[in-house]
Amino acid sequence: IDGYVDNELFIDEDLYLEYIDKYGKPEAGDVMVTGVGTLGVCYVVKQEDRFYFKDGNILWFKQKAKDRILPEYLVKAFDSKDVKEFIDKNSSGTTVGTFTIQTAKKMEISLPSIEEQRNIIQKITKIESVIKQRRQELQLLDDLIKARFVELFGDAIHNDKGWETDTVEKLCKEIYGGGTPSKSHPEYYEDGDIPWVSSKDMKTDVLTDSQIKINQLGVDNSTAHMVPINSVIMVIRSGILKHTLPVAINAVPITVNQDLKVFIPNERVLTRFLSVQFKMHEKDILSGVRAVTADNIEFNSLKQRELIVPPIELQQEYVTFLEQIDKSKVAVQKALDETQLLFDSLMQEYFG
């Protein structure tokens, strides 16, 4: 995990020595790669490491040609788009993909000189460090948003400041879901200029676009209703609900698919305040996520969830604070996007 071995299971010393005697053991500089579940995650063995592994779940790349390839270079190669696509395309298994030794042997990567590999590693590592820093800055701003909320309003779930409360349903003029125009009618998507938002698009706090767009014909012939500007959008069915509750506000008119819900607040609650309050309830909401055919939120329960309703003037004070934070987030996000673009370009140049 994050470049470290997470030891959850242990074997005794005698068994460890028996395995080493029979099969050898990973040495410093060898690369271990996940072969089941999340594929292609790498770990470079360190000098002080003492561990063994479950054969079949982990691929062991022994460092036999130290004069030809650096272990860190191999790790960077596994992070490249081309190698990831190769693994995805060639992974076997219906529900759980597997990356096998046979597949690994067919994998090809460019192999420059050791000196050039060192230069590539240095450049990529430096850019990765900048990307990590930018993401940390965004996280700090998100933490500041939550801290200011608690400062003004207290605990949103336990309501320790004794605010008036009401249900999500009663704080909204409308709550509705979306739909998918039939894919068997390509004319619903031709020259589409209306964003059709899915969980894949819910990566920012403010929605302005989507990967797929539909046209008015698609809207008229489906349940993908037009969503007015300044509505709250939430993902209620997706694997991402295992760990994150995506919530956003749309800055342009959009449509959404059936995995999302739209909340149009009434005059008692401001849109931004409602959006942040959902995020303050994130852990509690996700604790009730059910996995049936897909991870999903029990919607009737969500509609009956009690939210705090402070005076609108205090909500506005908080929203004004958010607008100042937004300016900082936009600047950091722009820097992150530019750095990510440079990273992607270099990875394609070196490993494409």
Set out the residue ranges of the language-model regions:
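Non-catalytic DNA-recognition/assembly elements of restriction-modification systems
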Residues: K106-Q122, S129-G179, D191, T204, ...
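Periplasmic-binding protein-like
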Residues: V83-F86, H281-I285
